[in-house]
Amino acid sequence: GFIMEFAENLILRRMEDPK
């Protein structure tokens, strides 16, 4: 789906860039 991909992208970005 679209929402799932969007959420996954956000999570991946947050995990890669923890601040």
UniProtKB/Swiss-Prot annotation:
Membrane topology per record: Peripheral membrane protein
Enzyme Commission no: 7.1.1.2
Enzyme class, first EC level, given as a word: translocase
GO cellular component, one term: mitochondrial inner membrane
InterPro entries (UniProt xref): NDUFB11
GO MF annotation, one: NADH dehydrogenase (ubiquinone) activity
Main location: mitochondrion
Organism superkingdom: Eukaryota
Stretches of the chain forming a coiled coil according to its record: none
Record localization: Mitochondrion inner membrane
Reactions that this protein is recorded to catalyse: a ubiquinone + NADH + 5 H(+)(in) = a ubiquinol + NAD(+) + 4 H(+)(out)
A UniProt-annotated Pfam family: NDUFB11
Signal peptide: none
Alphabetic keyword roster: Membrane, Mitochondrion, Mitochondrion inner membrane, NAD, Oxidoreductase, Translocase, Ubiquinone
Physiological role: Transfer of electrons from NADH to the respiratory chain. The immediate electron acceptor for the enzyme is believed to be ubiquinone.
Assembly description: Complex I is composed of about 30 different subunits.
Name of the featured protein: NADH-ubiquinone oxidoreductase 11 kDa subunit
